[in-house]
């Protein structure tokens, strides 16, 4: 369970993710958003999952965080379609959850850094890039995308 903040822009952050994470993170983002929706009293999306995980808590912390996660999840679903020419069911779940989006993603709070300490800096984007290069590069592939500059 994580969100890879590889850029402050939720769409660019999705585009910078490797194939493995594009597949995995659409589902995880839908689960976090669904858990936040259920905490607000709405029976939408998936059943609650990992409600005490720092990233799930962050998504639910403010409407602005939820908005960022919605935009990121939708962008991940679009990335999945671009790379694999298929529609991911979790993308449809995220579309359903947009009805609860009443925040401004540019006003999000600083996200937790869910990674080993060795990659952490004051800048969460740089931290997630460090984590990606240090821990994910060995399996990172980019179908129908150029490998991001920070991964070269």
Question: Predicted regions: what is each one?
Answer:
Residues 1-152:
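Expand to "…catalyze enediolate/carbanion chemistry for C-C bond making/breaking, isomerization
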């Amino acid at each position: 369970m994580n969100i890879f903040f590889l850029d402050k822009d939720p769409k660019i952050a999705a585009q910078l993710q490797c194939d493995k994470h594009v597949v995995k993170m659409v589902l995880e983002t839908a689960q976090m958003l669904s858990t936040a929706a259920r905490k607000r009293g709405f029976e939408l999306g998936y059943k609650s999952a990992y409600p005490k995980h720092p990233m799930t808590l962050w998504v639910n912390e403010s409407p602005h965080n939820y908005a960022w996660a919605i935009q990121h999840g939708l962008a991940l679903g679009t990335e999945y379609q671009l790379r694999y020419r298929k529609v991911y069911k979790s993308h449809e779940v995220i579309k359903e959850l947009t009805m609860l989006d009443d925040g401004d993603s540019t006003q999000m709070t600083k996200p937790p850094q869910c990674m080993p300490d060795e990659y952490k800096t004051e800048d969460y984007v740089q931290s997630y890039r460090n984590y990606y290069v240090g821990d994910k590069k060995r399996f990172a592939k980019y179908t129908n995308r150029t490998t991001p500059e920070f991964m070269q």
